[in-house]
C-alpha cells in the first residue's frame, strides 16, 4: 500500500510463500532411530527449495508461490525474483544471519 500503483504486491502470494518457503525441509531431513536428525536420501540429492517447489506444484499451489519457494535461498541468486520473492529471500537471509551470530557460527 505504501508504494501504490508503482509497485504491486500480491499479499496472498507473499504470505503463502513466507509460510511455505521451507516446506521442503520436511522431506530433506529425517529422524534416525536414536532421535537425531540427518539428511534423507532425497535431501542428499535435492535441497529444500527444489523439493518444496515440487510439493507446491504437486498440491496445486499457484506457480507464483512455487516460484517463491524455489528461489528463496541461494539457488535463486542470479535469477529474476518476483517482488514477493525478494521480500521472502531478504527476510530469510536476515533470520539466517541472526541465528548464525546467535549460535556463534561466524
Say what each PLM segment does:
Residues 3-106:
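Divalent metal-dependent catalytic cores for phosphoryl transfer on phosphate-bearing substrates
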